[in-house]
């Protein structure tokens, strides 16, 4: 019994010390493991020029290695739910410098860079830089215009640049017909009505696709209503200045000598004045429904 008590007391003294030792060992292992992962982020040469000199005729192979490393890096960070993607750009920079024709690196790399954290690096500026480099090296590849236009539209909210980028891509060999359609829509959203009108007119005259021709026709009619409504609203402001209140109808504006006749939309339906005193397409006009379809958010 005495021997058992002695053994129990001995275990009580030894076990805490043993657990403490195991804890310290595990902590050291964790620290070294984290340091190893951190080292993996930094292990490859970051200088594109230096890598170009080192690899010589093996540059294309080295580019594939760097691109593969970029994909693995992005995937591992997501699996570990980490948001620090600071090594992503250097990897893509080296890969596309070593092989300027590595198209997947431009396309998917731009997606990795442009998406907001935690899905991506939150660096649309670097995505633009990467895609512009790709376009310089691959000037006839219209898909890069599509990708660049998407970055301008989705991440930077620059609709005019998105439209111009899509328009440039639409002129390249093999470009999909919808590139010009999207260019026109982006330019409309960016208030570039004149350019959008030219594009829709070209599509109406040149396209052999009846669906595209119908889309072009309706959008041209909607653009005309935009111009008409703006002009009527400008006259409505003069009515307010003259009477101290907004107009309630087009007829009231005509009685005030501000407008002659009854302006109608391209389908022949008169415009109306809403409760807010502003002009709009009549709910009786076919364009009222078309506007809700063709002017939905992109």
Language-model regions, residue ranges each:
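Repeat-mediated protein-protein interaction surfaces in helical alpha-solenoids
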Residues: 44-57, 127-132, 162-166, 213-214
């Amino acid at each position: 019994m005495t021997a058992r008590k002695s053994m129990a007391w001995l275990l009580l003294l030894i076990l805490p010390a043993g657990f403490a030792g195991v804890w310290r060992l595990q902590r050291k292992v964790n620290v070294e493991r984290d340091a190893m992962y951190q080292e993996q982020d930094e292990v490859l040469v970051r200088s594109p020029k230096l890598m170009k000199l080192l690899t010589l005729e093996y540059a294309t192979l080295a580019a594939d290695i760097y691109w593969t490393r970029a994909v693995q890096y992005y995937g591992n960070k997501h699996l570990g739910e980490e948001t620090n993607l600071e090594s992503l750009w250097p990897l893509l920079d080296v890969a596309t410098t070593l092989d300027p024709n590595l198209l997947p690196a431009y396309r998917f790399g731009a997606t990795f860079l442009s998406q907001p954290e935690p899905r991506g690096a939150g660096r649309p500026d670097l995505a633009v830089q990467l895609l512009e480099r790709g376009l310089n090296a691959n000037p006839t590849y219209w898909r890069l215009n599509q990708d660049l236009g998407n970055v301008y539209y989705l991440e930077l909210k620059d609709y005019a640049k998105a439209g111009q980028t899509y328009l440039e891509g639409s002129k390249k060999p093999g470009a999909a017909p919808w590139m010009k359609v999207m260019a026109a829509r982006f330019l409309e959203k960016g208030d570039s009505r004149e350019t959008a009108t030219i594009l829709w007119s070209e599509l109406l005259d040149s396209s052999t696709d009846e669906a595209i021709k119908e889309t072009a026709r309706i959008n041209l009619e909607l653009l005309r209503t935009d111009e008409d409504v703006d002009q009527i609203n400008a006259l409505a402001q003069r009515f307010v200045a003259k009477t101290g209140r907004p107009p309630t109808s087009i007829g009231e504006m005509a009685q005030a000598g501000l407008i002659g006749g009854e302006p109608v939309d391209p389908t022949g339906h008169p415009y109306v004045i809403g409760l807010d005193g502003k002009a709009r397409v009549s709910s009786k006009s076919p364009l009222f429904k078309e506007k809700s379809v063709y002017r939905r958010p992109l």
